[in-house]
């Protein structure tokens, strides 16, 4: 008999859950390939550490964007490798529950099913991310009383009201963690003449990012290259600056919640 597996195939991270073991994979949704041979060099954390550091022959990339697959072959290979790492092959072809954004097309849904099925999965069941988030938070989604869930991921923010076991109303916007990283990169380039990668921007966001009552004004040292000379350069960014960058995106999310 196949075993049940839950897969959260996110824009930024991929997580795999087994009923008897809990979360067995929690890795960045990144894959590194050899551009000459198409060989897979690394996936997950190892590939993430290569972002912005590969030679011209290799490329480290996110094969998902905005919660949907942008490179089917790379996602297929990434899933196969991650599943092989948890040794499910000898158990048989398992049944899988996979999370998807609340507002994607039927074509995009089919791409997720096909990518997972190609790894030897017998059956794939799709669950909308707000439903999975609510269940994970212990919310009774069968209650007649509506509950609102705001799931801020890497590529999308999913907003939904759930009641009686389903979604009453939902909205998905492409303003989330990755958009914040992109805004940090643009800000640093404009103010400090400093080029940084997505990994550095994300680390700064996690370390000192805050909206509202910031409290102590902390700093984070950014390392990158000078836009003009290309030479190594570093600069300190403050939590006040990160807060100013965050405001527009968080305001948009709040507006969508209230609308």
Positions of predicted regions on the chain:
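Nucleotide/phosphate-binding catalytic cleft detector across ATP-hydrolyzing
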Residues: 1-152, 160-259
